[in-house]
Every structure is written in C-alpha cells, then in structure tokens.
Amino acid sequence: MLDFKPHRPPTTSLILDAASDLFFHHGYGNVSMDWIASAAGTTKVTVYQHFESKEELLLACLHHRLVDRESTLNARFAERTESPACVLDLFDWLEASLKKNKFAGCAFTKTVNEMSEALPEVRRIAQKAKRLLRERMIALAAASGLQDAEELGNELAVLLEGAQVLSLIEHSARPFRTANHAAMKLLTFHGWTPSQEQMGVTLEKY
C-alpha cells in the first residue's frame, strides 16, 4: 500500500501539479511541454532538467496522482475502519472528488484510453490504482465483520467504477446516488443492519 507522500523538491512538485492538471483536463496529445512550463511558472529547459521526456513526465504524473490519492484515503480512514458505513463514505469521497473536477472522469482510465498502446506502462499504473481501491474495499468490508468480504469488495469496486464512468458521460452526480443505494443493499445482504438514520441518509441521497 502507498502510505506516504515522498519528499519532492518544490520545482518538481510545481511541474507535476501543472502537468497532471493539464493532462487530466485536456488530454496528453493536446498538451505541449511549453504549456506545462508556462502553467508551472518555469521554463521548458527546467522541465526537461527534471524529466527527460514528455512520456516520462506523464508516468510520473500518474504515480504522483496515485500516491496522493492513497495518502488522502489512508488519512481519511485511519481511525474509522470498523463500520460498514465507511464503505459508503468511500463512495461519498469519490463523488465529492469528481464534483470538484466537474465530472471530468478518472485520470487513470482516460490515460489508458489515450496512451496504452503507445506507452504500455500507463496500463500497469492504472491497473495498480484500480487494484488498490478494490483491496481497500475488501479491507473495509473485512474490518467491519461483513460476510464474504472479498466477494463484497469486488462487487463494490465494480459499482464504484461504473458510477465514475457514468458520471463522466452524464456530467452528473446521479450515478453515485444510484450506486450508493445499491451499495447499501449489498452491505445489507452481506450482514449489515443499518440504523434508521443511516438508511434515511442513503435514501435521501437517492
């Protein structure tokens, strides 16, 4: 599990942040190194001093994004992993993240769609990102004492992925409301008895 944020020199972080944002919102092929340098407040020469090629920068951006995501989730669930409600909280977290990014989709999925043939390593990083999220679902289910935690975690991961894709297509949070309601049913099937308050919150979202 990626459970820390590595120390990065300030200029490296500025370049990674700028490039990650540009690649995510505009696509790899539409973003030039000049644009990245300008967005990072530096020069193209400096960018190349830190990253030998645009491809190397893309891979670094994906790894940077994955480490930051895992660090955020580790902190979010550090002291509250023994309630099935934490599983629903993961759905809430991803919905909030996508809203913040205006339902622009998943950076890993989008990069695989665009670059997996030209740069196969992006698929391996994306697979790792999806695997870590699935394993987190399984771990949360197991810590909560739910039945068949691995099966449940796999089912929830598919729900989460589907909601993410549909939210991009529909440009809406509606798929997450549906997924949250379906997740509640799955959790109940696997042994959770939610309180009336918890049921009310989920139905209200739905």
Which role fits each region the language model picked out?
Residues M1-P10, G191-Y206:
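N-terminal intrinsically disordered/low-complexity leader segments
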